[in-house]
């Protein structure tokens, strides 16, 4: 009888300790993500075409599925070609669903716009628990689809520009048109996570950034602070969004010849464009790294994300270095206790300034 009881208890313990048994539900948060726009370059912008060879890898790094909806059939080859390019550069074991919408935008100056759909925070596998990751990036890190009901990327193609788009995939875009494959490659970059979640109030000159992305963690002010660590909302953050910001990630710096890549932060804030792009003046003439600048010139073609963008995404997939502490941590919030006969367990939420004061652990 004693042996039987021991065996039963042992079996129960083994079952309870099994990683697949009675697992607590994972807790994470998600919020809607904004759209980022891709604009036509100003009329008269000169562009010297530089031939860029299309690059192929033997194996795709991810499976990207497309829902074309009402997109015209003649657009599909260029869109598929752009998707194939990114499937060779973005690694994920979780399939990525893309929604293509063909619809009129607010201005014909907008070629297209893209959104990751949602940001996710606090999921198992997140490199940093205080950062909000774009859906495709979050799924890649988590190893599973955190939101199976919704696409990871949504791209809006401006239907009012139909006659000005080049739909071929051979790179021979005439100077009178805009290359659709290049547009989609750019927009997919945003959809996969190349974007800030900051916002700007032009009436008061204040900026806000309540849910920073990994992009915001690597965007750096001249004084060395991370963009995500500037008080939000504040006039100081508004000033930061309209002054010099650079990329501080090690991979991006290495690929950019040891120089911190400059981000696009015009003095007059541009909604849907500022911060979430590489600097136009610095990179628009680059043979390989002009992909994520905010404007596309007539006849401009790129059939690869470029080494700098790929390196910056690699930076975003790991935990960013701690920022510069600003002030001492304030008192914890919502403190409560579970009191027992011989012990008590305390529960609390982080101080309101935990991020800027660089609180990482509690002892």
Predicted stretch roles:
Residues 1-8:
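Bacterial N-terminal signal peptides that target proteins for export
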Residues 4, 16-19, 341, 358:
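Intrinsically disordered, low-complexity segments
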Residues 22-185, 191-323:
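Extracellular zinc-dependent metalloprotease catalytic-domain scaffold
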Residues 17-18, 200, 324, 356:
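Residue-level recognition of conserved structural "scaffold" positions that shape functional pockets
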Residues 8-16:
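Bacterial N-terminal signal peptides
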Residues 323-360:
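Pro/Thr/Ser/Gly-rich low-complexity, intrinsically disordered linker/stalk tracts
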